C-alpha cells in the first residue's frame, strides 16, 4: 500500500474527535493491508518502529532534522528555523516546503528507511542519518513529508494510544468489537503490538486462545488494589493470606533464556545495561535455563553496626541515579542496589500465569538462590489481621513503603496488566490520614514568579478517563518541588510543548495554562481531599460536576509509568465515594 494513504489517514485522524469514528477509520484501513504491512503499520500508528522493549529511538533531534529538511528542499537552515519558530512543528515546515505532487513511496519503503536510520551508528552516523532522512523527504509529497518528519522525531501527535488500535483490530480481524476485551488481555501478555496484529490478521478471534507469555518479551505488570483500612483487608481477603514487604523502587521483570538475561521496566523498556550487577548475580544464583521473574529493584545496602548486620533502604530518588547510559560503573558504586523478587511467571517451557499464587511462590523459592543482591521479598502467611498490622509497622520502621497483602485462594492467578483483586496494598500515607497518592499526567504549566521565575510555578495535572481514552484535569500542583525536581521536570516537558490544547485532553476555559503539554510525563502527588469542582473536567458528565484534588503536594516523577498507567477517573471517584 502507498504511504500516501496512511499519511492521509493520519491527517484525518488528527482532526477527528469521536472515539467511535477514530476506531472505525483505523479498522477500515487495516482490513486492506496485506503481509508485513499489518505489522509495520501497527508500529507506525504508535509513532514507533518496534515494540517498547526494543530500542526504537532513531537518534535524530531537532538540530539534525533542521539540517535534513534544509538539504531536502534546497533552503537554508535559518529559513527552516524561522518557519519552525512560527509553526512549532517541523512536520508542518516540511509540508510548507515540499513541492512534490506525486510519490511512489509505499508503507514498506518508509518503514524500512526508518529502520535504516535507527540502525545507523558509529563514526559518521549523524551525517549518514541526515542523508537518509533528507533523501526520503525528497521523494515524499507534502502530506507524506509532514508525517515522515513527525515519525522520525517521535512526535506523531494523533491524540490516542494503543487501546484505540486494539479496538480497531477487533473489528478488522475478527469482524466484531465484542472481541476487543480479549484482545486487550492478549496485549497484556503479547506486548509487541506489531506481532499481535500479525497473529490476529492470520488467525482471527481464535488467536486470543493461544497467545502466551514468551521469555524475552515482557508482560504488563500485575498491580495492587487499594484498601481503606485493615478491617477492609479482612473482608476482601478471606482466610489465609500473605503479607509481603512493599519496596519503594523500580518494578522489574527479569527474563533468562540460557545465558541471555534481560531486565525490563514497568514501561516494558529494556534496562539491562543499567544494572549489570543484577544480571551477573542472576546468572550465578538462578539455575533454571528459562525463567521469568517479577520483582522490585531498590537502592539498598547491608551494613554492619555494633557488630550487627542491618538492612539499609534508601529513597527512590537515589535509584534514579542509575537511569543512565554512561558512567554505569561509577554510579554502580555510588548507588548499590538489590532486587527483591516476589513472583515467577515462566519456568523451563511452562507459563505460570494461570497457576495460583501459593504454587508460584513455592516455585520462586525453589528456583532462586539468595545472594547479597538477589533477594526474595520478605513475607508472613497468616489469617490474623492483627499480625498483618504488626508486620506493616515493622516494615515502616525499616524505612519501607508498606505492605502488599495477597490472596492464597486457588484462583489467585497472575493477572497481567490488571489492578487485581488478589493483591491489596497498604502504605504509610494511608495510616497517616492521607488516603492515597495519585499518579497524574502533566498537561500544562503556569509561569513561575519570584525564585521560580524562568521555570514553572505550577503544573496542571490530569487523570485518565478510560471510557473516552482522554485526559481530564484534576488539580494544579505547585508545592513539594526541589530545585533539582523543577530542573528535571522542565527538561522532560520541553520535548512535549505544543501550541494548543493537545488532542485527547479536556481543560476548562478558566483553567487554561500558560503552556500546553502533550500527555507524556507522569508525577506522583499526595493530596488531602477529593471534592466536586466546576473548574475541572475529571469525571464531568451531564449530571455530574468535575472532581478536584485539594492541597496536592509533589512527591516524585514516575519515570516508570506511561500516561496510560496514570490514575483513572473511576479510581478517583471510588476514593471520593469510599468504595
UniProtKB/Swiss-Prot annotation:
Coiled coil: none annotated. One of its GO terms (biological process) is lagging strand elongation. PROSITE patterns: DNA_LIGASE_A1, DNA_LIGASE_A3. Signal peptide: none annotated. InterPro entries: ATP-dep_DNA_ligase, DNA_ligae_ATP-dep_bac/arc, DNA_ligase_ATP-dep, DNA_ligase_ATP-dep_C, DNA_ligase_ATP-dep_cent, DNA_ligase_ATP-dep_CS, DNA_ligase_ATP-dep_N, DNA_ligase_N_sf. Its cofactor is Mg(2+). Pfam families: DNA_ligase_A_C, DNA_ligase_A_M, DNA_ligase_A_N. It is an enzyme of class 6 (ligase). ATP binds at residues 244, 251, 266, 296, 342, 419, 425. It catalyses: ATP + (deoxyribonucleotide)n-3'-hydroxyl + 5'-phospho-(deoxyribonucleotide)m = (deoxyribonucleotide)n+m + AMP + diphosphate. Keywords: ATP-binding, Cell cycle, Cell division, DNA damage, DNA recombination, DNA repair, DNA replication, Ligase, Magnesium, Metal-binding, Nucleotide-binding. DNA ligase that seals nicks in double-stranded DNA during DNA replication, DNA recombination and DNA repair. PANTHER family: DNA LIGASE 1 (PTHR45674:SF4), DNA LIGASE 1/3 FAMILY MEMBER (PTHR45674). Belongs to the ATP-dependent DNA ligase family. This is DNA ligase 1.
